[in-house]
Amino acid sequence: MKNLIFLFLLFSNATFAQSGRIQIAFLGVFHMGESPDYKQGSITDLLSAERQKQIQEVVDDLVKFKPDKIFVENTPDTQPYWNGVYRNYLNGIKPNEKSSEYNEIFQIGIKLAKKLNHPIGVTCVNFVQPDLVVGTRIARNKVDTLMTFYSHELELKRPSYDDYFLRNPSVKKAFDDYITNYESWKNLTIKEHLLNLNSEKSISTLHYFNITGWMDTNTNSFGAEFTAKEYYRNAKILQNILSSVSPFDRKLLVIIGGGHVQVLKDMLKTHPYFEVVDANKILNDL
């Protein structure tokens, strides 16, 4: 009922329609802390004085965009934790856990929220399909139960990444070329690194070897299913974003792993009430 009321207010409000679309920017990032990615994108000296100065430069650029909400790649069940991190940071207390401090949610999202005097900090919108035991326990309906069983059975067919690359030479080449470039970016400033990562070529390559590449050789005869599962995950992420938007929001920032950016942009670019803004234009001072 709450979402229905919101949609009515947002998409039927004549004042909103006259005032223009909501701007939304997707900032693709390397996962600074722990992540399940095949290759970690960490920068080992992130907490050094020089790197922290570079982080502040990025935050200062994002401040100029003035997002009303900041969305981050963690699941909604972790929202209370990050609310606590934000409250502590407002009082000058950094996270005790290294994995939390060494994380783009804190380093960019929380720091940006503080600069903007946001009341709630960041909003968690990630979606991860739960495993069989958890998924069947928390299922709200038959569809949830069926999706849990479907995901479980599909994952049993998923090859290792090494096997995936062995069977898909074009994906392997795209991945190797990307990693070669990526390693060279580690010598750049954080801003330069993000500008490279969010370039059109980088985002499209990430989309290819993370999502659509599964279909090239119909991996294990389930190529389309692996690709569809990635689209489903991103659709759930977008649903979480849309469900968190209020009629008063004018600008939104999504800080998320680079592999998600292309599909999320594609899903929103035809939406009549949203305007996708290039994150690199923001980093380049609009």
Language model: regions and residue ranges:
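A cross-kingdom marker for long, charged
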Residues: 221-286
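Hydrophobic, often amphipathic alpha-helical segments used for membrane interaction and targeting
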Residues: 82-85, 92-243
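N-terminal post-signal-peptidase region of extra-cytosolic proteins
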Residues: 49-59
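Short catalytic/ligand-binding loop motif for oxyanion handling, primarily in non-cytosolic enzymes
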Residues: 33-36, 78-83, 130-135, 261-264
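Bacterial Sec-dependent N-terminal signal peptides
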Residues: 1-22
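Short, well-ordered beta-to-alpha junction loops that form the rim of enzyme active sites
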Residues: 72-77, 125-128, 182, 256-258
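Proline-aspartate-enriched helix->loop->beta-strand connector
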Residues: 66-72
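Acidic/histidine-rich helix-loop elements
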Residues: 31-51
